[in-house]
């Protein structure tokens, strides 16, 4: 389909629009969508836990995160994929000790939005009040930051690895999609990006 193996990573904090954009881009370009959050949720469900409980378990069990990373790296090696997750860019770039290798990413994207906007989005999506959404987001982010620093020695809030950082609160969903498409299209037309 493409003249290159396409590996696009999309990261961002909860409620920033990563899943929405990853799904839309995967559908638009005919790419697989490998979603770290979905893998994590499935693992939580398998253990009969909600995300908060499982996040706490994951703090003491690095094998959970390492398994997610391995699955994402395998997908990156197969190519023609959108990898979604806070560490997806690190995984695709081969930056983590257990998934070392060449940088396979065609484009590394980070989506962001202010906490209040993200809390409103999560509240709407999950049918909870905004205050509860804010609390859950902050708890999850705290847990993840701790895990990522302890397990990998990386700070996922360091955005220097990303090619494109976009504040999704400034544009509508369709406008955000158009901006991302405008960044991706030229890369897919080139033989050697």
From Swiss-Prot:
GO terms for cellular component: cytoplasm. It comes from the Archaea. One of its GO terms (molecular function) is dCMP kinase activity. The keyword ATP-binding applies. Transmembrane segments: none annotated. SUPFAM superfamilies: P-loop containing nucleoside triphosphate hydrolases. It holds the Pfam family Cytidylate_kin2. InterPro entries: Cyt_kin_arch, Cytidylate_kinase_dom, P-loop_NTPase. Its main location: cytoplasm. It catalyses: CMP + ATP = CDP + ADP; dCMP + ATP = dCDP + ADP. One of its GO terms (biological process) is pyrimidine nucleotide metabolic process. ATP binds at residues 12-20. It is found in: Cytoplasm. Its EC number is 2.7.4.25. Belongs to the cytidylate kinase family. Type 2 subfamily. HAMAP family: Cytidyl_kinase_type2. This is Cytidylate kinase. It comes from Methanopyrus kandleri (strain AV19 / DSM 6324 / JCM 9639 / NBRC 100938). The gene is cmk.
């Amino acid at each position: 389909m493409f003249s290159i193996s396409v590996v696009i990573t999309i990261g961002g904090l909860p409620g920033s629009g990563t899943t929405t954009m990853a799904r839309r881009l995967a559908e638009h370009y005919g790419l697989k969508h490998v979603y770290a959050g979905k893998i994590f949720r499935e693992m939580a469900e398998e253990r009969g836990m909600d995300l908060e409980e499982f996040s706490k378990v994951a703090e003491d069990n690095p094998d959970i995160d390492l398994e997610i990373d391995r699955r994402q790296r395998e997908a990156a090696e197969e190519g023609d994929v959108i990898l979604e997750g806070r560490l997806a860019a690190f995984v695709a770039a081969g930056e983590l000790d257990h998934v070392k290798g060449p940088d396979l990413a065609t484009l590394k994207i980070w989506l962001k939005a202010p906490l209040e906007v993200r809390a409103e989005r999560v509240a709407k999506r999950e049918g909870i009040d905004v205050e509860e959404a804010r609390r859950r987001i902050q708890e999850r982010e705290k847990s993840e930051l701790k895990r990522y620093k302890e397990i990998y020695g990386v700070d996922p809030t360091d955005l220097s690895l990303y090619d494109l950082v976009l504040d999704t609160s400034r544009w509508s969903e369709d406008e955000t999609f158009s901006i991302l498409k405008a960044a991706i299209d030229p890369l897919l037309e080139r033989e050697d990006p």
